[in-house]
Amino acid sequence: MSWYEKYNIVLNPPKRCFSSCADNLTTILAEDGNNIRAILYSQPQKLKVLQDFLATSRNKMFLYKILDDEIRRVLT
């Protein structure tokens, strides 16, 4: 018997993000640019995945206004 078999974890299903959740996300993106920049630069593989995703899914609905200027520079 492995040590982890005695643990039982029950996760609640994910909740849908409503407008207040989206507002919180945009506030974090706008206010914490230095931390986000450091995270992006420290994880080049994730940055590449994000760049590829944005390049393939870019459309007129995506708002770059919510992104910090430095993140926008890195992603484009």
UniProtKB/Swiss-Prot annotation:
InterPro entries (UniProt xref): Poxvirus_A2.5L
Induction record: Expressed in the late phase of the viral replicative cycle.
Disulphide-bridged cysteine pairs: C17-C21
Keywords from the named record: Disulfide bond, Late protein, Redox-active center
Similarity field: Belongs to the orthopoxvirus OPG128 family.
Subunit: Interacts with sulfhydryl oxidase OPG072; this interaction involves formation of a transient disulfide-bonded intermediate, allowing disulfide bond transfer. Interacts with OPG088; this interaction involves formation of a transient disulfide-bonded intermediate, allowing disulfide bond transfer.
Function comment: Late protein which probably participates in disulfide bond formation by functioning as a thiol-disulfide transfer protein between membrane-associated OPG072 and OPG08. The complete pathway for formation of disulfide bonds in intracellular virion membrane proteins sequentially involves oxidation of OPG072, OPG128 and OPG08.
The protein's name in its UniProt record: Protein OPG128
Natural source organism: Variola virus (isolate Human/India/Ind3/1967) (VARV)
